[in-house]
A protein has these predicted regions:
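Detector for Asparagine
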Residues: 15, 19, 66, 78, ...
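Metal-dependent nuclease catalytic cores that hydrolyze phosphodiester bonds in DNA/RNA
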Residues: 2-144
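Mg2+/Mn2+-dependent nuclease catalytic core
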Residues: 130, 134-237
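DEDD superfamily 3′-5′ metal-dependent exonuclease/proofreading module
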Residues: 4-24, 153-154, 158, 236-250
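Generic preference for flexible, low-structure residues
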Residues: 107, 111, 148, 212-215, ...
Length: 250
């Protein structure tokens, strides 16, 4: 599992020419309705209602977040959370538009700095695009979610997940990101038959070059299954595939 802080020459909002990123229509996946319930965000799928992978993984950082909220106070914590969430949404949309060969809507200098640093990485590594913001689910895992990007990254098919941060991250701080991307790898293969065995976590960082973490699906499956089991147990839910929890997933 590697982390690289990458910069490439050039600063521009669009590459020259049209159809800069080539899109490959592999499978048309049906949209999934998402609802908010007492146990978090849930997607309605043809095989049942499954919790969002982000909801499942959020419980892993709950204690640390609660300690932070007590330390800084509810008012400041709410403000920081809103600001972070809004920025993340904006940066995700900019990256999505850019990969769709549209000019991103950039409304602040800080957003511009972060997006353009990530854009340089996208320019250098993204090849053929298999899909963006695809709704995914797995009956085997009993989860669902929406993946940011599936593409050829430096010539090999990969899941790409965008994140934003106010500061640089250490590898040990992003275990949940690795589990989330692993879940997308498994869900995509289950729905399409196309295996994806690697992923990229691209993190835009305030006033810093972006960070790029690389990982392999099979290195994170056991941790992912433990997280899913913890969520189902905590909420007294019945899993559609109980045998999953003997770590038989491969």
């Amino acid at each position: 599992m590697l982390c690289q802080r990458l910069t490439l020459a050039g600063s521009h909002l669009l590459k020259s020419g049209e159809n800069m990123f080539q899109h490959k229509q592999v499978h048309e996946l049906a949209e999934l309705e998402a609802i908010t319930t007492e146990v978090g965000r849930v997607y309605k799928t043809p095989d049942g209602a499954f919790p969002s992978i982000t909801t499942i993984l959020s419980r892993l950082s709950r204690d640390d977040i609660n300690k932070w909220r007590k330390r800084v106070g509810e008012e400041k914590a709410n403000k920081v959370s809103r600001t972070s969430s809004s920025r993340g949404t904006r940066i995700h949309k900019m990256c999505e538009d850019y990969i769709n060969n549209k000019k991103p809507d950039i409304r602040s200098p800080l957003d511009k700095q972060m997006f353009m640093s990530m854009q340089e990485i996208l320019d250098g590594f993204v090849g053929e695009v298999y899909g963006q913001e695809l709704p995914l689910y797995s009956k085997h895992l009993g989860i669902a979610g929406r993946v940011d990007l599936i593409c050829e990254w430096n010539g090999k098919l990969a899941i790409v997940d965008y994140k934003t941060s106010a500061k640089l991250k250490k590898r040990e701080w992003v275990n949940s990101y690795f589990m989330q991307a692993t879940a997308y790898c498994i869900m995509y293969e289950e729905m399409t038959g196309i295996p994806v065995d690697r992923f990229v976590i691209l993190i835009g960082v305030d006033q810093e070059p972006p960070q790029t973490f690389y990982g392999k699906r099979n290195d994170n499956i056991a941790d992912l299954i433990d997280a899913i089991k913890g969520y189902y147990d905590e909420n007294n839910l019945i899993h559609s595939n109980p045998s999953l929890f003997d770590h038989s997933c491969s």
